[in-house]
Amino acid sequence: MMSSVSTESKLQQAVSLKGVDPETCMIVFKNHWAQVVKILEKHDPLKNTQAKYGSIPPDEASAVQNYVEHMLFLLIEEQAKDAAMGPILEFVVCENIMEKLFLWSLRREFTDETKLEQLKMYEMLVTQSYQPLLHHKPILKPLMMLLSSCSGTATPAVEGKLVVLLNQLCSILAKDPSILELFFHTSEDQGAANFLIFSLLIPFIHREGTVGQQARDALLFIMSLSAENSMVANHIVENTYFCPVLATGLSGLYSSLPTKLEEKGEDWHCILKDDWLLLPALVQFMNSLEFCNAVIQVAHPLIRTQLVSYIYNGFLVPVLAPALHKVTVEEVMTTTAYLDLFLRSISEPALLEIFLRFILLHRHENVHILDTLTSRINTPFRLCVVSLALFRTLIGLHCEDVMLQLVLRYLVPCNHMMLSQRWAVKERDCYSVSAAKLLALTPVCCASGITLTLGNQERDYILWSKCMHDGSGSEEQLLPETPCSPSSPSPPPPPAPAACIVEYGKALDISYLQYLWEAHTNILHCMRDCRVWSALYDGDSPDPETFLQSLSEESRENSGHPEARLPQQSVRTSGQTKDKSQSELEWDDSYDTGISSGADVGSPGPDDEVETPAPPAPIDPPKHIQEMKKNAILLFKGSYIEESDFQDDVMVYRLCAEKDTEDTTEPQKDTSEPQGDTLEPLEDTSEQQEDTSEQLEDTSELQEDTAEPQGDTADPTAEAQPKLQPEAQSLPTSNGPLSSPDPETESQPSRESSDLCQNTFSEAKPENEPGVALALDSELIATTFEAEPQSELAVVSTESEDFIAQYDQIIQELDSGTEGLTEQSIPISEPSLLTQQEERREECKEEEDDDFDSLMAATPAVEAGSSPFGVGEDTAFSSRHPVRTQSTPFTGPFISVVLSKLENMLENSLHVNLLLIGIITQLASYPQPLLRSFLLNTNMVFQPSVRSLYQVLASVKNKIEQFASVERDFPGLLIQAQQYLLFRVDMSDMAPAALTKDPIQEISRPESDKTLLDGPPRVLQPFLGNRAKVTRAPPNLPLPVKNTMLAAALFPEFLKELAALAQEHSILCYKILGDFEDSCC
C-alpha cells in the first residue's frame, strides 16, 4: 500500500503548506478519509457479509494507498499553535484512523510487503512530523501492534526497516523521556516484555553489519535513559534478558574466532586494528565488546553491576580461562593475543576491573591465571613475545592493583634489602651516582660506532665522548658523562672519584638528551595516573608490619573463597617432608607470597620466646608449577632465576645456619654427618641433580668473577679468595677507612652501600693493567661485592667447612658433565679453592661466632626460609629475632622471570629483548620509591639471595665483552647490527610529534585504543613497531651470532635509557603525587 511513500515524500518535501488555510487542509483531509472509509467498509466482514478475507481488487488497494499518502503529508506538515493539537491531528485521534489502517492491512494478506509499507509510514510520521505524535495513545497503540507483529519475522528487508524504526523511536525517547511511561502502559498487553521496543532490539545486539550497529545504537539511547530513570533500569534488570544475552553473546562470538592466526612475520607480537579489521568474526566480537564498554559507561548502576557480573561468570571464567590453557602453543598464543587486544580496547573502569580481576585473582584448575601468564615468559616460542606484550599492556595501565600483585606486594615488607638500608628507599640521588654507574656498564667494545637514534636526529648526532679524569699514578679511570648544556658554567670539581661530571665544552650525545626528555615525560605521566593510589609505597606507607598482618588475615579469610583469593598466596610450610624433592621445594617456595602466616613457623629455636601458631598443612605444588620449574631449568640452564636459587651461593650457608638450629632442637641426631639430610633429597630426581649442579656452577662463577681483578697471578681465582674474605668480613664493622663516593654518602657513615661501592672506585689497580680493564672490572667487583660480602657474613656454623667440602664432592660425583652458558662454560670450583676457604674460615671462626646474633638481627630475612635441600618433618627455620618476623627474601615471580630473561639477552631474539626493555623501563618510570630504588638505585644493598637489575646488567656486560674477545670482526658486525636496527624504522609513517610521544602507541595502536593505554614513551621502541620497514636485510650470520650482535647494539641504548630515568627521578622524586601539574607541558 505504501510502497511509493518514501519516493513520493521526497518529491513532496519541496512543497510547503506554509500560508495555506488550515481549514482548507482539514477539508481535503476529511474528503480523502471519506473515500478511504467507503473502501474499508466495503471489505469489512462485520459490515459487509459478502466481504472475503484477502480478496481486495488491486485498483481499490491502489486508491487507498494514494489517499493515505496525501493524508499523511497533510498530517506531517500541520503545525499546531501553542501546545494544542492541530485540527487534523485531533481528527486522526478522534476517528482512530491509524488503528483502522492497521486493521485494513491485517484483512489483506499480511505479507512482508504489507509490513514494509506500515513500517515506512510510521517512520515518516515519527521523524518528519512537527507535532509530538507519540504522545497520543490512538497513534502509539497501532504502532506497538505493528512492532509486535514484526517481532518474529526473518526477512532481512523487514528486519532492516524494523531496526531503523526502533532506532528512531529510541532517539525520540532519549530526547523526550516523558513519552516513556506511555510506552510501558501501551505495551502492558504484550506479556512479560512490557517494554516492547527494548525487547525487540535484544535479538539484534550481536548482529553484524548495519542492522546490528543501528540496534546497538538504539539500545545505548535506552541505556542512557536508564541512568536517570530507575523504572527503566529495574525493568531491564528484572524483566529482560538483556545482560545475559549480552554476556553469553560474547561467549558465542568468541567461540567463532580463529584459534590460530596467520603468520605475520617475526615482528608480530600483538593484534592491531589493521589486523582484526580483516577478520569478520573478530570485527563482530570487537563491536559487541565495544558495545558492552559503552553500556557500562552510560547505564544505570544496577544494569552495570548485573552486566559485569554476567560477563565475568558467563564469558571470562567459563570461556576465556579454558582457552588460555589449550593444548597447543598456537591456540594459547592466539588467546593471549586476544586478551591483550581486549585490554587495550576497554576504556570503562568497571569493565576493565573485571578483566583485571580475572587475570589477577581467578584460579583455573587451582592455578592462578597470573602465574600461568608469568610462566610463559620463559617459553622459547612466540608465546613468550605475546605474553610480554600482554604484560606491557598491564603495566602501562598504571593500575595499583596490577602493580601490587606483580611487584609491590613483594617489596612492601622490605625484606629484600638489608635492614640498615631502609632509609635509602627514599634517598634522592642528587649527584647522579646511579646514572653514572649504569652508564659505566657500557662495554668498551660497544662504545664506538654509531648510536641508535631516530632518522631525523641522525644528521645532528654527536658521537658520545668519554671523559678521562687524570688521577695520581695509575688510578686513571674511565667515567661516563652527565648531560648538561655545553654553554653552562663549568661545573664544580668532583667531590669524589665516583662522581659523574662532564668537562666543559665536551660534545654530548644527542640521543641521551632525547632519553632525558622522554624519561621526564614518562615519569610525570605516571605520577599523574598514580595520584589516586591508596599508598605511596615508600617503605613506610603502607606500613610493612601491618601489611604483613593484613595479607596473612586476608589469606585466611579468603581460603574458602577461591574467586576472591589473592594470587600467589599458596601457604608454604617451613617444615617440609623428607620425601619431597629439592626441586619441588624450591619452586613451591618461589610462589609463596613470603608473607603468609605460617612462613616463619616451625620448631622453635633456642632463642625463640614468642609462641607462634602451628603451620598449615603442606600443599603440594600443582603440576603447572612443576612444569614452570622444568622449563626454567631446560631453557635457562646456567642463568639467573631467583625463585629457584640457581646461583644462590648463600644457599649452602643457610643450610649450615639451619643445622645449628636443628642440632639444638634435636640433639639425638648425629651432627658429625651433616650430609645425611641432604643425600636423600639430592638423590630423589635427576632434575634435582641439575639444580644443585647449577647452584655450584653459579657459586663458582661468582667466585671466579670476584677474584679476577685482584692481581696478575698464575692462579688469580685461588689467590684472590683469601684476600677478599677479610675485606668482606670487615665491611659491616669498619666504616672508617673507606672514603665516601660523594658528599651525600659521607653524611651517612652507617650506609653499607657506600662502603661496597667505594671499594671499587678507591682501590688502586696494578700499574701494568690497562686503565680500560679496570673500568670494566670495577663494575663487576661492585656487582659481586654487593652480594658476596653478605653471603660470607651469613656463614655461621661450626660444621660449615666440613659440610661444604662434602657437598662439593657429592655434586661433582653426581653430575660431572654439567653444561655452562651458551657463550661460555663455567668450570666446577676446584677443591683447592674450597680448601683455602676452609682454612680462612677456621681462623675467623671465633670472631664469627661472637658476632652471629648481631648479624642475624641485622639481616632477619635470611633466617626465615626453609632449607632448599629439604629437612626433617620436625625441623624448620625459626626466627632469631622473634619481634620482627620476616620471610625468605623474594621479589616475586614476575620480577624474577623478567630478570632471568634479561640475563639471557644475548640468546634472546630481537623482539623479546625490545619487549623486555620496554617492560623494565615502564617499571622504572613508576614514582613509587620502593620500585624506583629496587630498579635504579645502584648503591642499595640487597639480601644475598636477591639479585638486582644492576647485577643482571653487569652480567650481560661481561657476556658481551667475552663474546667480543673471541669474535674477530666484532666492530664490523656491531655497525651492521646498528644499521639494521636504524633502518627498521620507516620515518615516513611517523608524525613529527612522534618523538615526544610513545612511538609504539602512536604507530601500533588504533585510534580507539589510544584513550586508554598511554604507556610511557620510549625512544628504543620504534624498532619494535609492527610497521617497522626493513630496508636492509639483516646480517647474514648464524642465528646465535645475529642475536648476540643485535643485543650488543641495544645494550648501550638500554643503559642510557635507564640512566636518564635515574637522573629524572632524582629531580622529580621530591614532588608529591599531585603537585606536578605545573611541570606538565
Swiss-Prot record:
Residues 567-576, 727-738, 746-762 have a biased composition (Polar residues). One of its GO terms (biological process) is protein localization to perinuclear region of cytoplasm. Residues 474-496, 544-623, 658-770, 863-883 are annotated as: Disordered. Residues 680-707 have a biased composition (Acidic residues). Residues 486-496 have a biased composition (Pro residues). It holds the Pfam family RAI16-like. Residues 553-564 have a biased composition (Basic and acidic residues). May be a component of the FTS/Hook/FHIP complex (FHF complex), composed of AKTIP/FTS, FHIP1B, and one or more members of the Hook family of proteins HOOK1, HOOK2, and HOOK3. May interact directly with AKTIP/FTS. Probable component of the FTS/Hook/FHIP complex (FHF complex). FHF complex promotes the distribution of AP-4 complex to the perinuclear area of the cell. Belongs to the FHIP family. This is FHF complex subunit HOOK-interacting protein 1A. The gene is Fhip1a.
